Amino acid sequence: SLSDKDKADVKIAWAKISPRADEIGAEALGRMLTVYPQTKTYFAHWADLSPGSGPVKHGKKVIMGAIGDAVTKFDDLLGGLASLSELHASKLRVDPSNFKILANCITVVIMFYLPGDFPPEVHASVDKFFQNLALALGQKYR
């Protein structure tokens, strides 16, 4: 679980990430699709998987919006993300291990875009948050 310090670190980090969420999200999604090509299977319905394509641009908005929403639900991620977990488990049928892959790609991109605002202790807090987020999104798979 997240400590009060972790929550504070994530809120501060998100305040800096949020204005650049579109850029960070697009880069992270494009990076995931390139570095982990097996993830493309979940986006086969998209005509173009290149980083600047319309579907990728839309996807990054959805993903980064969901992360921003989760930042407001620290104390009840399971309840707050239940419907999103259900969607990914039942309809989209995304392998839950991919949540961790995407979180890793987002973390890498954050470090590139905001190096001075992402020291190791903040990185650790954001990583814990993403781990909790992945667990919450994977809850309906059980």
Curated annotation (Swiss-Prot):
GO terms for cellular component: blood microparticle; haptoglobin-hemoglobin complex; hemoglobin complex. PROSITE patterns: GLOBIN. The gene is hba. Heme b binds at H88. Red blood cells. It comes from the Eukaryota. This is Hemoglobin subunit alpha. GO terms for biological process: hydrogen peroxide catabolic process. Involved in oxygen transport from gills to the various peripheral tissues. This fish has ten hemoglobins, 8 of which are anodal and 2 cathodal. The cathodal tetramers do not exhibit the Bohr effect, due to lack of the C-terminal His in the beta chains and to blocking of the alpha-amino group on the N-terminal residue of the alpha chains. The possession of both anodal and cathodal hemoglobins may be a physiological advantage for fish living in fast-moving water habitats. This fish possesses 6 types of hemoglobin chains, including a major alpha chain, a minor alpha chain, two major beta chains, and two minor beta chains. It comes from Catostomus clarkii. InterPro entries: Globin (IPR000971), Globin-like_sf (IPR009050), Globin/Proto (IPR012292), Hemoglobin_a-typ (IPR002338), Hemoglobin_oxygen_transport (IPR050056). GO terms for molecular function: haptoglobin binding; heme binding; metal ion binding; organic acid binding; oxygen binding; oxygen carrier activity; peroxidase activity. Belongs to the globin family. CDD domains: Hb-alpha-like.
